[in-house]
Amino acid sequence: YRNGRFVSISKEKIPVEREDLENTFLWISEFTLEKEDRIIFFSDGVSQSGMGTAKMPFGWEDGAKEYIANLVNQYNDISAKELAHKIVNQAEKNDGYSLKDDTSCCVIYMRKPRNLLVCTGPPYDEKNDKYLANRVREFQGKKILCGGTTATIISRELGAKMEVDMNIVDKELPPISKMEGVDLVTEGILTLGKVERILTEGDIDRRREAGPAELMVRMLLNSDKITLLVGTRINTAHQDPNLPVELEIRRNVVKKIKFLLETKYLKDVEIMYI
């Protein structure tokens, strides 16, 4: 799918020798992909969905192409994952929410990598507060601030107003905040801990919750290159002898999140300590 339309691609028929089947062959195509191209392929459980109904006596057929075109034209940055899910869900709907055949769909989307910056914890040296703020301001991509002190530093250095958003709640976590120029502002170590648990459990799409941790996980999984900027200052205002332990907990949780994102979700992740 390219520039708002489906592109015809030449195919070559190649015979394949198999002992269990006669007259077996493959169709081979070669082509050069361009930025924003999408390759979409699916099983006949999709193309034949709805077969025998009054609306689709012969199945979905070309209606699937029309459905895909409408979706992509309306949401031109729709992810490969979301597009594949929507196609399969519509096929299930065509079959009266009871699929008649195995139904699979795969989408490949050629696009620029999506970058995400996650900042958690204040810099070790207060002189680096300005450096942290500049990193946030100049970063080309989505931005998450994880921790009240971190958010306060960015708000102060960039002159950005911050306000609590009570529309998104989680009984386990403090609410998120809103800040101009930042996509998500959350509490720190508790939120990171829940993010790690969700990534470990997997299957985020089946979770009904929509709290701070779930929002953060979805942003992580919708990104390709993720930078975790971890501050190493101990907040002396708390006067808590356990704070060095808390700092180590934050480091360990961030390392676990990095490991999960790289090994389980195939993300490109970098940790930077400041």
PLM region spans:
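Conserved subregion of the PPM/PP2C metallophosphatase catalytic domain
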Residues: 1-267, 273
